[in-house]
């Protein structure tokens, strides 16, 4: 594989996703070939709003100049109005994601880069939708882990979008073990780290204080870590979350596994939100998403920061190339 071919799915058409995609293709890429799965008219409208060139090509075509973008069309029921999402267009958004994923599962494409979606709008259309991560996992019939990353830090989550009161009961030995195995496999295969060092945070303050501040560490976390260490995994912890992110500590980790959403992600976003990306570990192909929302208030104005989409695309290309190299070696 000279360059991986990646699906580019803008997400919510009324948000900033389409214009960020237009910005993305203004420079020639040496690391991948992009194929958009989107509504052509929406991308053209975004290009016009930004006064940037855009030439949509057949899906198999090779870009020749700035603004060239191969596309697999998923036309909307109603014309897009930036800043005003329309539930009638949600089926096309979901269809674009599903077809892009199918192309990757069958080896036609080698990874997916996704823009931000609007969950409420999709659900208002009558489609039950909890998130793109869950959608892709169900389609591929596999277990996945959400990891967010920036140039300074990688944080994976044992639980994701749960009310805080539900988190302790959700953290079972089976879930934690599955999460750690997926993270370890991804760090070895996708990121090329032969022996990854994975820091595992405790659930409770001070990692439970030997049971005085909660028993989850003693009853669930430590037994799982001991079992996986016996297999050769390098797992540090359970660590107290209040000191685990000190710069002097972070240099000793390749990834951090946090027990819940707001335990790990605020630190990551503080350390570099603009270049933060969302990686779905465990899929049979790399999927990297932007780590920001639809920004409806900015849509069509040309002021949205494209850094996260640029970072997501570059990382997805690297991960796809890494998987291809591993496949050749095996």
UniProtKB/Swiss-Prot annotation:
SUPFAM superfamilies documented for this protein: Isocitrate/Isopropylmalate dehydrogenase-like
The keyword Magnesium is assigned to this record: yes
Enzyme class: oxidoreductase
Pfam families: PdxA (PF04166)
EC number: 1.1.1.262
Pathway: Cofactor biosynthesis; pyridoxine 5'-phosphate biosynthesis; pyridoxine 5'-phosphate from D-erythrose 4-phosphate: step 4/5
Catalytic activity entry: 4-(phosphooxy)-L-threonine + NAD(+) = 3-amino-2-oxopropyl phosphate + CO2 + NADH
Cell compartment(s), UniProt: Cytoplasm
Co-factor note (free text): Binds 1 divalent metal cation per subunit. Can use ions such as Zn(2+), Mg(2+) or Co(2+).
Metal-binding listed as a keyword: yes
Binding residues annotated for substrate, in chain numbering: 133, 269, 278, 287
Cofactor: Zn(2+); Mg(2+); Co(2+)
Binding residues for a divalent metal cation: 161, 206, 261
Family matches, as InterPro entries: PdxA, PdxA_fam
Chief localization: cytoplasm
Family: Belongs to the PdxA family.
Additional facts recorded: The active site is located at the dimer interface.
Subunit comment: Homodimer.
HAMAP family: PdxA
Protein role: Catalyzes the NAD(P)-dependent oxidation of 4-(phosphooxy)-L-threonine (HTP) into 2-amino-3-oxo-4-(phosphooxy)butyric acid which spontaneously decarboxylates to form 3-amino-2-oxopropyl phosphate (AHAP).
NCBIfam families: pdxA
Listed name of the protein: 4-hydroxythreonine-4-phosphate dehydrogenase
Gene: pdxA
